[in-house]
Amino acid sequence: MTSSVWQERRHGEDKQRRNDHRSPYQRDRARILHSAAFRRLQAKTQVLGVGMNDFYRTRLTHSLEVSQIGTGIAAQLRRKYPQHKQLLCSMSLLESLCLAHDIGHPPFGHGGEVALNYMMRDHGGFEGNGQTFRILSKLEPYTLDFGMNLCRRTMLGILKYPAPHSKLFVAGEHNEITNHRQLKPSQWPPVKGIFDDDNDIFAWVLEPLSEADRSRFTSPQQGSHPALHHYPHLRTQFKSFDCSIMELADDIAYAVHDLEDAIVMGIVTASQWHQDVAPTLTNSGDTWIRQELADIGNKLFSHEHHLRKDAIGTLVNGFVTAIVISEDDVFEEPLLRFNATLEPEFAIALNVLKQLVYKYVIRKPEIQMLEYKGQQIVMGLFEAFASDPERLLPLNTQERWRESEQQGLNSHRVLADYISGMTDEFAGRLYQQLFSPKAGSNVELSKEM
């Protein structure tokens, strides 16, 4: 059903080793799992700031949970749809996507992303998913120039937003800020797409598609989505089959597991659950949701740890088993023709949980203060490096910056690459070294690259 062209790598397979009988996707999974970029996720913010509590999830633990949920979704779909077993040919492929999906996210979560996007506003912007694509295909030093050199299908699956920045960007009217402290994230949302600097790799990924499929797959939505009325840019509208599974797993992990963190830390209370969640789910058109609601609510806020874990497991199971395969018969390529989707009533329930996390966790002033602080750190670092790259950047990054300048490329992208790869702790420590008179004199720039 799917062509072998999707297993091809840009640089071929030059890592054949003795008695290595792994599949191409098992190799991809190993490359991601053993990468420095993946390890750094242990010290990057998920929702609650690193250091707020010894229970919180980091982007690393989140990615591991997304991987487990993703393979659970695939196993369910295999049983439901035996006719699509060739589409669901590799658990290692889905694990690869789920493990890698957050690799490009910068320090300090959304605050760091908005800060880098602002600093890159005249140089192609910045967005975490676009950076993930760039790390996998170009930056991670598994090969000299081809990043991890992953299979084409893996790279297709990581494309949550398959269109270049220039195709999606809509210029808005902004009041030019005179001080970084004035930056409002709502005024500088990142374009969700691929950086134009990586168009050559993007074209290679889409090479097997027909012209009609390629044109439609990369076409932006016409008109604004009602849920995105504050988002000024165009949005992509399609994703591959593998990506649809990864994205559902990510959404489930975000809504359920981040909610669990918030409940344990006392940020979300039973009264908020009954006010914001219960009314919608009580009137659900799905019998299972209505029947399980009261029991789940009681267990989530129980003082018995095992009861709360049972409720979390029930929620995850409910969403995973409510996923179906939908078909868009306009596409010729099976990887685009089919997508995994949630049954409508469960999609509503998942959105209610996501909104609960957003309202009481993401928008909590203490969380926003951490984001704001991270925003200032990232902008301060970028401004310093941009002022004198050959003085302040580590030597190997200086070399990349010089090569970019000499070749007439986007040298600011090198600065974004360097800063986005930092952990929260390293970025904060480096900021102190640069700007605090009381900071020590030993700066270990090389440890991050």
Swiss-Prot record:
SUPFAM superfamilies: HD-domain/PDEase-like. The keyword Hydrolase applies. InterPro entries: dGTPase, dGTPase-like, dNTPase_2, HD/PDEase_dom, HD_domain, PHydrolase_assoc_dom. Coiled coil: none annotated. Keywords: Hydrolase. Residues 59-255 form the HD domain. GO terms for biological process: dGTP catabolic process. Residues 1-27 are annotated as: Disordered. Pfam families: HD (PF01966), HD_assoc (PF13286). GO terms for molecular function: dGTPase activity. Residues 7-27 have a biased composition (Basic and acidic residues). PROSITE patterns: HD. Belongs to the dGTPase family. Type 2 subfamily. This is Deoxyguanosinetriphosphate triphosphohydrolase-like protein. It comes from Shewanella baltica (strain OS195).
